[in-house]
Amino acid sequence: MKTNIQQYFLILLILFFSINVYSQDSDDIINKVKEKQKLLSDYKADIKIKVNIDFLKVPDVDAKIYYKKPDKFKIVSDGFLMLPKEGFNVSPESFFKEDITSVFVKKEKLNSFQTNVIKIIPNYDQSDLVLSTLWIDDKEFVIRKVESTFKQGGTVVLDFDYDNKYLTYGLPSKLKFTFDLKNMRLPKNFSGFDTPGKKKSDKSPSTTGEIYIIYTNYEINKGINDKIFQDK
């Protein structure tokens, strides 16, 4: 009997220390991502937005993106921007600005990159976010992928590509944004399949949409006037 109690105690002790080690791992990894972000005060860049939705024909849009620490973020374009609200703000500090609990899950190969998989849970009920899973590069400590579930907006997935030139700041060269169409309100003038002479596809339209954003001409830490972020 005494031996069994000792065995149970040993198992509990191992579990306790394992949980603490994993918790410490997740905090350390996130702090390394934040350290990289401390190098960045502001940036602006040109972006090209490509929308891929089965039943919509949306032209590519050129725009400018602005970010200023700690949380100023804006996209400016003369064209029509169809961007889902939930999860779209990918400013460097947006993933860690809330009061969160983080848990290290595992190490995983993502494409050709070794990553740390970390789950993030907000610590208050008012948050629209339910859960985020982050794939963080084990060498460069940049975010390679994020999958987030929201209370009202379903699930969104962000996939990041980086050029070596801007890797120091954790700024992407390309972003793929995948989202649930059923949770997105579409403009009335987009009725779908309304191109003259175009035959309707027999296939059921996809339930997900994709937005690709290509970043060029970064200007980093040059200073940005706060007036840029004011609504006109």
Give the positions of each predicted feature.
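Bacterial N-terminal signal peptides that target proteins for export
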Residues: 1-9
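N-terminal signal peptide c-region/cleavage motif recognized by signal peptidases
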Residues: 18-19
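Flexible, processing/modification-adjacent segments and terminal tails
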Residues: 24-29, 38-39, 47-49, 57-59, ...
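Extended lipid/amphipathic-ligand handling interfaces
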Residues: 32, 63-68, 158-166
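Sequence/structural signature of outer-membrane beta-barrel proteins
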Residues: 52-54, 182
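Gly/Pro-enriched, hydrophobic low-complexity segments
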Residues: 114-229
